[in-house]
Regions:
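Surface-exposed patches in mature extracellular/periplasmic domains of secreted proteins
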Residues: 64-73, 133-139, 192-197, 223-227, ...
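C-terminal soluble interaction/assembly domains
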Residues: 258-351
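Acidic/His-rich structured neighborhood in mature extracellular/periplasmic domains
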Residues: 98-240, 244
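A short structural micro-motif
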Residues: 75-79, 143-147, 340
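Sec-dependent N-terminal signal peptides
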Residues: 1-19
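An acidic, Gly/Ser/Thr/Pro-rich helix-cap/linker signature
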Residues: 25-127
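Ligand-binding pocket segment of bilobal, Venus flytrap-like solute-binding proteins
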Residues: 221-277
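Short linear loop/turn motifs
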Residues: 70-77, 225-234, 256-259, 293-299
């Protein structure tokens, strides 16, 4: 059906609600015992299923044409591989030393430095406007997609439909994102049947979920649409806007290394928060490589090396990075890549 004459854009039957989308829904808390992943078959969805009919009702209430929505969903295909990928993301299966080795490669460091050289004026302007250092804008891009090289091979419609209707553990979140995707494709003039992204439905060089795309993407050069695949001005400004909106503090530290003295081990908190203070962590035996005062909100992070557990302490800007991806491994990789890119440019300037 996808190869038939279905390359249309969604039409509105009325005013599409929400020029500004609501904030992305936080991930649902994991149950005490995780349910087994559902077993699904590849193929089109049965649109008579009550949950699909309810979804159509919900998006139609937001102004989308019911018939057009039904036609688009009829083209969606359930993808068993998507469920498999959701069950084993790299951030959950790798130790820090393994994850860091994957992310801090010469390709990513050199690529970030090269992109900075090519777009220095643009990056400097955006950094000033949004008060976010350029190296962190580049590092998010590097970790996410190697600067736009790997933006995903799945049809986003398939990915979001599979997770919305055949992945009970996160179904409410992904049904919301599927609705946001249908609204987004209309607003940006995209064909919902051809947009590709990750197995989770993230799109473009920044891997924004549809709700984040609608809320945080910026039309920096005032073109017809917000293009997060090919337009560097939109890409840089959008990641800067995302970090800025979540409370990035310009010039403030992200991480500090720490050493544990006189205690066997410390257990990092299960959930990402800044409920601790530097003083409280120091009182538990941590020597933290920073001159920040004891009252500074802080987060203990475990960074497993090959043969020993090391510790780091995250601050407000670390927390902001985890709003992009809640894994502390991800946020540490973004920080370390940012430092590596900046160091490489500094070394080149010294020659």
């Amino acid at each position: 059906m996808r190869n038939a004459a279905l390359s249309f854009m969604l039409l509105l039957s009325g005013t599409v609600a929400a020029a500004e989308a609501p904030a992305p829904e936080p991930p649902a808390a994991a149950p005490a015992t995780a349910p087994a992943a559902p077993i699904i078959e590849h193929g089109h969805f049965d649109l008579s299923r009550p949950e699909i009919q309810s979804f159509v009702d919900q998006v139609a209430a937001q102004g989308l044409d019911r018939g057009q929505v039904t036609t688009v969903l009829a083209a969606a295909e359930a993808q068993p591989k998507i469920i498999e990928s959701m069950e084993k993301p790299a951030e959950k299966t790798l130790q820090w030393w393994e994850y860091r080795a994957r992310m801090l490669t010469p390709l990513r460091i050199d690529g970030g430095a090269q992109l900075w050289r090519e777009h220095k004026e643009l990056l400097d302007r955006i950094a000033i406007e949004y008060q976010v250092a350029p190296e962190y804008l580049l590092a998010v891009l590097g970790v996410e997609t190697q600067y736009g090289r790997t933006t995903g091979k799945y049809h986003v419609l398939d990915a979001l439909s599979t997770l919305a209707f055949d992945y009970p553990a996160r179904a409410p979140f992904f049904r919301k994102e599927l609705g946001e995707f249908l609204l987004l494709t209309h607003e940006e003039g995209l064909d919902p049947l051809t947009v590709r992204g990750s197995y989770a439905g993230a799109m473009g060089a920044l891997q924004f979920m549809p709700s984040s795309y609608r809320r945080y993407a910026v039309n920096a050069d005032h073109a017809a649409t917000r293009d997060l695949w090919n337009d560097w001005a939109d890409i840089f400004a959008s990641v800067a806007n995302y970090l800025h909106q979540y409370g990035w503090q310009y010039g403030a530290p992200v991480l500090a290394d720490a050493q544990l003295v006189g205690v066997g081990a410390l257990t990092p908190p299960e959930h990402i928060s800044l409920n601790d203070s530097l003083g409280a962590l120091r009182a538990r035996g941590l020597i933290v490589d920073t001159a920040l005062p004891d009252t500074t909100p802080a987060l203990l992070i475990g960074a497993q090396q090959q043969d020993v557990m090391s510790y780091r302490v995250g601050f407000q800007n670390f927390y902001v990075i985890t709003r992009y991806n809640t894994s502390p491994l991800y946020a540490m990789a973004v920080h370390d890549l940012a430092m590596a890119i900046k160091q490489q440019l500094g070394q080149e300037a010294a020659l």
